[in-house]
């Protein structure tokens, strides 16, 4: 905090009259400081970086009230750096996002490589130990560069035909937010040794409900959850249980496959895992503060999704299903029947079906099974199970005259599926739809101001997919060119959507689509004054 010094005339003091005269002169000199015009003070404080602003808010009640008015509106700022030095890159993005008044409520750091613990420590030193922080390793980042505010992308690129990836330089994206009226913290999912998947899933849901009860009141739902998950077979069931448990108004976005560290708001540093514990995911939870309802209701979270896949118009039912437990991730061997037919097809026959329709197109692209999983869900033992249908993607890894081989597990005999392929035209049309959604947001009667944006983009998209840079950033750039947005390239994009499918009895069936591939999931944070 800058010190304010007053110029005093050099004078010789003699007697009480001289002292009294000097006191009156000093008090007269101090009046302009104490009674500084509020608008002038507002303009001065508005230009301070975050640290100086924090000191200024402690000067006196008047300054504090002006600071509070400056921060009466929410802020969400992202910036990235390509600096190959991890420490300097971290300092660059921290300097950028803290270059204006803000009281950090949460920080998200995404790095392409390097040491997550170092980044977590650096951020904690700059923003304080009471701020929840998530650090994750991702396959790429996008947003605006800290040094020039220009939009750009940093991605992993294939270095050989065996699809090994390499990043020559470190890059970091930092996102910091202040949302008055909201409480923000991190709810982690750690699977303890011997803990069943069902116990872990239920505990996560109950931890969320308990936090909401404490912050927002009984039966309240989170406004938003941002999820970062590890590459573990335990992740998918947790996410489906969460999708089932959270009401439709809760916005949920994230990345399913990656690495992360986290620090909760009440923890001074990252908590080390116990031996044999497994880090599954961390959820950044946004809850409306029941003590500040007016402010909380002015903040809205919205999502938009750009899908990049199209289905082949052939429907199958899984016949024989066998799971193979690999060293890191399980895989599934299956045969299938065409819907309405009795003949069991092996893996080669299934792909020959697709090959005949698409004229060898399948072998030029990634192919996926889009499996409709109709399952019963409940929370704990007291709740009656309910059925939810979800569309889940499994990448095709090969076939022979016996089986079709796909990634992952959880497919059951009788599950219906179609083959899905990346489709550039679908992706481009979907991006235009997302951009139109954002335009419509601007034209709402209450005229919300978009204050933040974040994108979770499939790692196979980007310039190599679209043939041009910044395509996945275009909805933000076209509609909000000044917005300091950010985003990551990841695997397993998380975003809630509902689709209607025609069932076997010609009835429409609602199907949840929560986990995506070849898509972009956009989070938009807006504020209504």
From Swiss-Prot:
Repeat LRR: residue ranges?
265-288, 418-441
Region annotated Disordered sits at 1-22
Report keywords, A-Z. Answer: Leucine-rich repeat, Repeat
> Which positions fall inside the F-box domain?
31-78
Q: Does the keyword Repeat apply?
A: yes
Keyword field contains Transcription: no
**Quick one: signal sequence residues?**
none
Name used for this protein in its record:
F-box/LRR-repeat protein At5g63520
Q: Which organism is it from?
A: Arabidopsis thaliana
